[in-house]
Amino acid sequence: MKITKIDVMILKPNQKNTGGGVKIDWANFDRNCRPIVCRIYTDEGLYGDGEAGMLFGVGALGTAGMMRDFARMIIGMDPLDNEVIWDKFYKQGYFTQSGGPIIYAAISAFDMALWDIKGKYFNVPIAKLLGGSRRKELRCYASQLQFGWGLELTPAFQTQDYVNNALKAVSEGYDAIKIDFFTLDKDGSGFTEEQRCGLLEPYYVDLVEERVAAVREAIGPTVDLIVEGHSFTDALSAVQIGERIKKYNIFYYEEPCTPTPKMQKYVADALGIPMGSGERIFSRWQYAPYIENLSLQVLQPDLSNCGGITEAKKIADMAYIYDIGIQAHVCGTALTLATALNFESVIPNFIIHEHHVVQFRPYMKELCTMDYEPVNGKFKVPEAVGIGAELSEFALTHCEKWTIE
């Protein structure tokens, strides 16, 4: 079997189809959503779909350009040779070694598509090819409740807003939630970098603690609470905040500072509570120092930007040696969601699955053929062959596309 053609696409979601209820364009939450995907075709009629994890922020055009360069390198190769292709991307791209998000997101998209083809070729879900599912359902948490929950995006400004969003998720059966308490002031204005970093003013620390304390009291002691930092604080301010909130039984503290192994260890050692990070850490080489210095207890590789399924499995195996858990970062289309569910069903050190608020958006749902939803805070593992999802006809006809043959 040979790769004959590759389509690289920047999708154009119907962002008028928000489902209603969007009360604020928080960091252009809806407006700047543009998934980057690929479809790899073969001479046997099989094809595979993959996603590059650059859904928000900057870098979409750069990622698509990187994918076009990579595509030329693998035309004519056997799509079942995912390890050979991965190393070709990494070693023969020259500047690709020790790369960043654009390079690894591009590799991830192709790797995902190759595994999709492999699953279809053997007529099994990729979980079977990864070694078999240890679990048929996955506990998940409601993620990013500062935006709101469900179709009604009601961003939290006042302390009661955080409480209301948390209780809404808990009422739907979730026994774990994640919230960023750090970003917005009481009036909805964003805190500046100077206000979030360095030695903090009492007002900021008091406000964060007030919000965390209120949510913990509302949800009770049996619901796990993940505190999301988004690296908006630095190591110094993260420790100040962490000292105030750790008494509220934090499940783990995510991205408390810019990802660097030494500063992450400084925060971990100072606070003595579980730490998570990973959506901006790429490849086993970048994860290795965090694993070796034990500064993270939960690694969060994104299968659409860490280097793909091939690389994520290696990262998980490395972490397993050190009793470090895995929670895949998931913020994309159903391609990434289904892939993560397959992957997390296999690994022994799975912690919990992330169910991101973006996956409620109708414009995201119409990009793929499958729409996976949890029931009472648990996802069923996909049974469809391949990664378990494909691009929809809408996606294929609403995109900017480059074809490489």
What is the role of each PLM region?
Residues 386-405:
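Extended hydrophobic packing segments that form well-structured cores
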Residues 243-252, 258-378, 382:
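Shared catalytic-loop signature of beta/alpha-barrel
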Residues 38, 43-44, 49, 81, ...:
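Ligand-binding pocket scaffold of soluble enzyme catalytic domains
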Residues 3, 45, 70, 110, ...:
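Conserved, mostly hydrophobic/aromatic
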Residues 41-121:
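Metal- or metallocofactor-binding catalytic centers and their adjacent structured scaffolds
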Residues 137, 142-261, 265:
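Metal-dependent enolase-superfamily TIM-barrel catalytic cores that perform enediolate-based chemistry
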Residues 133, 139, 219-228, 268-278, ...:
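Short beta-strand/loop segments at the ligand-binding rim of alpha/beta enzyme cores
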Residues 1-49, 53-55, 358-365:
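Structured beta-strand/loop patches that form or line metal/cofactor-binding pockets in enzymes
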